[in-house]
């Protein structure tokens, strides 16, 4: 197969932390030669007034994706906040609409990867690993963030998100903590790694 490697960074963000990580992931993927990257979000199911009352980020510039388009990409990198150790309802609703893709095997052999954010660390890893189950059912090739790629994973000099499962950030109980440069670096490296693997599988 020829042509550019197409990577979709698909996310849901409540307070902007995942949106920030998603942009870093997309930047990393775009750093790989021959890669075309799109940044999109899943539809928001929460009413705008309820979001505003909760202090959530209502306006986000990324266009909204449709479940049907996932098969158009060589890799999809999913980003979701944590809700009780799992993905958000918005992301769940989106994935629940991919049954038609599953029936056709449209995602078999595509690369899938996940990044997340948590308030204080609870569910940081379970959100990613439980998300992987969905990717396995679709026959996707699951890619994480190896220590050999994300060398910041060895650094314990400060509190940070990120693991071999994928990039992440700790937002804090009040959501005021923003992704650090180390967390953003890991996100970029995850994007680059996924794009590299997808290109090799496409070749």
Curated annotation (Swiss-Prot):
Tell me how the cofactor is bound: Binds 1 FMN per monomer.
Q: Binding positions for NAD(+)?
A: 15
Q: What is its EC number?
A: 1.6.5.2
In this chain, substrate is annotated as bound at: 102
Q: Would you tell me the Gene Ontology cellular component terms?
A: membrane
| Keywords, comma-separated and alphabetical | Flavoprotein, FMN, NAD, NADP, Nucleotide-binding, Oxidoreductase
Domain of life from the UniProt record? Bacteria
What PANTHER family does the record tag this protein with?
FLAVODOXIN-RELATED PROTEIN WRBA-RELATED, FLAVOPROTEIN-LIKE PROTEIN YCP4-RELATED
Similarity field = Belongs to the WrbA family.
The name on file for this protein is NAD(P)H dehydrogenase (quinone)
Q: Which organism is it from?
A: Parvibaculum lavamentivorans (strain DS-1 / DSM 13023 / NCIMB 13966)
């Amino acid at each position: 197969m020829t042509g550019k490697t197409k990577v979709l960074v698909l996310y849901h963000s409540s307070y902007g932390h995942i949106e920030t990580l998603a942009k870093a992931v997309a930047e990393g993927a775009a750093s790989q030669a021959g890669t075309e990257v799109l940044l999109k979000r899943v539809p928001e199911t929460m009413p705008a007034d309820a979001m505003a009352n909760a202090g959530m980020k209502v306006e986000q510039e990324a266009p909204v994706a449709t479940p049907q388009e996932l098969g158009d990409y060589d890799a999809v990198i999913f980003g979701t906040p944590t809700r009780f150790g799992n993905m958000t309802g918005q992301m769940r609703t989106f994935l629940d609409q991919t049954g038609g893709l599953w029936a056709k095997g449209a995602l078999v052999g595509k690369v899938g990867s996940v990044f997340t954010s948590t308030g204080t660390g609870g569910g940081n890893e379970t959100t990613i690993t439980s998300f992987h189950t969905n990717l396995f059912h679709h026959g996707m090739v699951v890619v994480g963030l190896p220590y050999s790629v994300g060398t910041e994973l060895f650094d314990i000099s400060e509190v940070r998100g990120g693991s071999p499962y994928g990039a992440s950030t700790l937002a804090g109980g009040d959501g005021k903590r923003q992704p650090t440069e180390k967390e953003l670096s890991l996100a970029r490296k995850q994007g680059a790694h996924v794009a590299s693997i997808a290109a090799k599988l496409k070749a």
